[in-house]
């Protein structure tokens, strides 16, 4: 299923009025919303759609979205796009907008004149909707800024042999983000070529040269220092966290290796640490730690 990011941002940037406006895993992208507007989804489609909001706890989804937002803002790399979660969230936003419109027009009330007391729940709903919309806007804008920053790096990844790169991009980004990235990188490369590269010797015209002391490709800083909260709680089918261990004091923790120092350290459940991103990247992807 696909969502048009341009439409989303345009919709979310509008001023909210009473007649205009609650809504840690990385699922795959096998199901996406068809069309440019989530309002085009029919009730019959929602009933059989594996990402239908009614089949998931909205509070859990909201907490997952906050976790994705925190990780995206604090991580040096572009993280996998939560396709199913974002689809459910956008559907809930559309449904809540429609509900607020209905309530504000008084269609559900015998007396269609709204009193001060009857407006209070409506105002609370609008406030919660604005909170969710801010979260979605911030999440998408953060991702777009990383796509801009690492444009050449991502393009290089998309050109891996046997379509491995394109498959990776499809998992890493939404369909619209991939299209945005391709168009943006094309414009950027054309600008570089017209302004500078075509005036240089042929052997100096490559923009993806990694030889020499300085790479021309801006890659994520894998050794960036980040703050993390060790949350744990990830279990397999047998109900056991396979990576959970205990330290010398018998406290539950995760063991990680700092390769440069060849040193093993223990991350206690519930504790906060400052550590290199590359050391805890796998734990973050699995949902065992959260960036803060």
From Swiss-Prot:
Its main location: nucleus. Residues 18-39 have a biased composition (Polar residues). GO terms for biological process: chromosome segregation; DNA-templated DNA replication; double-strand break repair via break-induced replication. It is found in: Nucleus. Keywords: Chromosome partition, DNA replication, Nucleus. It comes from the Eukaryota. SUPFAM superfamilies: GINS helical bundle-like, PriA/YqbF domain. GO terms for cellular component: GINS complex. Component of the GINS complex which is a heterotetramer of SLD5, PSF1, PSF2 and PSF3. Belongs to the GINS4/SLD5 family. This is DNA replication complex GINS protein SLD5. It comes from Kluyveromyces lactis (strain ATCC 8585 / CBS 2359 / DSM 70799 / NBRC 1267 / NRRL Y-1140 / WM37) (Yeast). The lineage of its organism: Eukaryota, Fungi, Dikarya, Ascomycota, Saccharomycotina.
């Amino acid at each position: 299923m696909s969502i048009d990011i341009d439409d989303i941002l345009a919709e979310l940037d509008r001023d909210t009025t009473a007649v205009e406006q609650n809504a840690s895993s990385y699922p795959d992208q096998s199901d996406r919303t068809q069309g440019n507007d989530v309002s085009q989804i029919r009730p019959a489609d929602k009933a059989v759609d594996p990402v239908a909001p009614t089949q998931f706890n909205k509070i859990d989804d909201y907490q997952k979205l906050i976790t994705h937002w925190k990780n995206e803002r604090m991580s040096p790399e572009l993280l996998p796009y939560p396709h199913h979660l974002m689809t459910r969230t956008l559907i809930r936003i559309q449904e809540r907008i429609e509900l607020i419109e209905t309530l504000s027009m008084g269609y559900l009330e015998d007396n269609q004149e709204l009193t001060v007391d009857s407006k209070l729940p409506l105002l609370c709903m609008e406030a919660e909707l604005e909170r969710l919309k801010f979260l979605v806007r911030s999440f998408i804008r953060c991702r777009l800024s990383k796509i801009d920053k690492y444009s050449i790096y991502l393009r290089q990844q998309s050109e891996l042999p046997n379509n491995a790169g394109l498959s990776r991009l499809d998992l890493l980004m939404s369909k619209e983000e991939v299209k945005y990235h391709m168009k943006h990188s094309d414009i950027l490369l054309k600008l570089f070529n017209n302004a500078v590269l075509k005036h240089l010797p042929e052997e100096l015209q490559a923009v993806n040269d990694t030889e020499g002391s300085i790479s021309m490709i801006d890659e994520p800083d894998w050794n960036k220092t980040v703050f993390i909260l060790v949350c744990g709680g990830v279990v397999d089918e047998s109900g056991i966290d396979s990576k959970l261990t205990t330290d010398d004091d018998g406290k539950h923790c995760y063991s990680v290796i700092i390769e440069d120092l060849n040193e093993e350290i223990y991350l206690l459940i519930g504790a906060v640490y400052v550590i290199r991103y590359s050391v805890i990247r796998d734990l973050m992807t699995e949902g065992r730690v959260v960036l803060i």
